[in-house]
């Protein structure tokens, strides 16, 4: 599988209005993404910040062509809007990875798996790279995946 990854640092909610996003930001990005999709490349989009107001706009691609990696987006809403066409991943807060308790980490991961894992297409991961993660929190994340992160037929 060949993949192109994009770090989207300026498209987040609050950086520009929805009208500005749809006029200036999205058309050129979509044109590049469409070209790579035509070449058979999966698009991995790291949407830094919240993309809650952008979800309907970015849901314009063929099924299986895009994985959206979210930092601070409502994942249940992202699953509802994008889940039929796109994979989604992320949204375990770096602050939780670094300063949370293993119990809080496991509970948060379980919630994400239960909200987003139904029907497939969800990858549990941190929302961004965490500096100095607590090893016990990473273990709790793995435990949550082992306990709750499987697909039932």
Put a short name on every predicted segment:
Residues 1-153:
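Active-site loop segments of alpha/beta catalytic cores
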């Amino acid at each position: 599988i060949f993949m192109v990854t994009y770090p989207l640092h300026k498209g987040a909610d609050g950086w520009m209005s929805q009208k500005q996003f749809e006029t200036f930001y999205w058309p050129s990005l979509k044109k590049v993404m469409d070209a790579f999709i035509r070449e058979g490349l999966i698009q991995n989009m790291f949407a830094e910040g919240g993309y809650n107001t952008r979800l309907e706009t970015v849901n314009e691609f063929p099924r299986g062509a895009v994985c959206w990696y979210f930092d601070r987006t409502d994942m249940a809403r992202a699953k509802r809007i994008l889940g039929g066409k796109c994979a989604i991943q992320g949204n375990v807060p770096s602050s939780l990875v670094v300063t949370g308790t293993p119990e809080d980490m496991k509970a948060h991961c379980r919630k994400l798996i239960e909200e987003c894992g139904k029907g497939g297409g969800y990858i549990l991961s941190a929302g961004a790279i965490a500096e100095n993660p607590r090893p016990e929190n990473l273990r709790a994340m793995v435990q949550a995946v082992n306990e709750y992160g499987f697909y039932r037929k």
